[in-house]
Regions:
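RNA-contacting regions in translation and RNA-metabolism proteins
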Residues: 1-155
Length: 155
């Protein structure tokens, strides 16, 4: 997670600087005052958030704002987090033409999740979003097609 040391004239100033520089809400940070001397405060600021939960919260809020009934399930393995969205009748709308809407949703979710990691010291997480098992079914169909074409070429 991101962390940084700040020296400023007040804790309020440190909070404002940290929010601006780290790009994270104040509620997602932990402030540890190291020293207070000569009208200066030295503070160690650490990001204290669960990025995987933030991604799920974003997707749930997105569904709610779009008036789409559905739920989001998350699966985590190694450094990959997969969000599986299940809806009754909005899969096509969320996937979009040529999967563009799904890809955009995955990209935005990845930005939200990885904003909590320091790119200089951490790799962050690989974020995948799937809607109604679309990506899994698509991968299976592509594998079958590749196998069929390979057999035709071999003849």
């Amino acid at each position: 997670m991101k962390e940084k040391m700040y020296v400023a004239s007040s804790l309020t100033e440190v909070e404002e600087l940290a929010v601006k520089e780290l790009g994270v809400a104040k509620d997602d940070m932990y402030f540890d005052v190291i020293s207070e001397e000569n009208n200066e405060v030295q503070v160690h600021v650490m990001v204290d958030a669960n990025p995987v939960k933030k991604g799920k919260d974003f997707l749930e809020k997105f569904l709610e704002e779009a008036n789409i009934l559905g739920f989001v399930e998350r699966k985590m393995r190694d450094n990959v987090v997969e969000y599986c969205i299940t809806t009754e009748n909005a899969n096509g709308l969320l996937i979009g033409k040529n999967s563009k809407t799904l890809s955009a949703l995955q990209y935005i979710t990845s930005l939200i999740v990885n904003q909590y990691f320091d790119p200089e010291t951490e790799n962050g997480l690989i974020v995948k979003v799937d809607i109604g098992d679309y990506r899994r079914r698509r991968d299976e169909n592509l594998e079958k097609m590749a196998t069929r074409i390979a057999k035709e070429v071999a003849k």
